[in-house]
Amino acid sequence: MAESVPITNLIELSGGSFLMGNEQDAYPADGEGPVREVFLSSFAISSTAVTNEEFKAFVADTNYVTTAEQSEDGSPPWSFVFAGLLPDDFPPTRGVLGAEWWRQVEGADWLHPEGPGSELEPECSRWNHPVVHISWFDAKAFAEWAGCRLPTEAEWEFAARGDLNQKRFPWG
């Protein structure tokens, strides 16, 4: 196995306390409440998402097979795809209750973002886009290969919020 590719776009964030979670009731079962104060030590996090090209290097180096490419029960592997990316004549499939914009698509994985027929070709302009259809297990394997670790939920929320204490969106 070749050496891992170091993540070069890490930024250091000073720790501190912040209010984590929210009590918005748009999705009551999302587990984001109650709001609680959390203290974090300083940590490093990538300033960008992992790209298709970076993930391709990981797969080429390790022969890794993602969760979306596997099937535990012999049925065809699948993943959820945003319904707005599917053709109008796409056959009805299982969705997610309360989030009907997600549709189950057989054959959707990181290399086929919208399912069969959407393969990332060698000359594709999406190699620098964020990789999709990646489970926590897939992300953890990539991070270990790259010599990093995944951020904790608190670190992720702290980084994503920036200085926007308890604001749901950047504009308020």
Predicted regions and their residues:
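GGW-centered surface loops in extracellular recognition modules
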Residues: 2-12
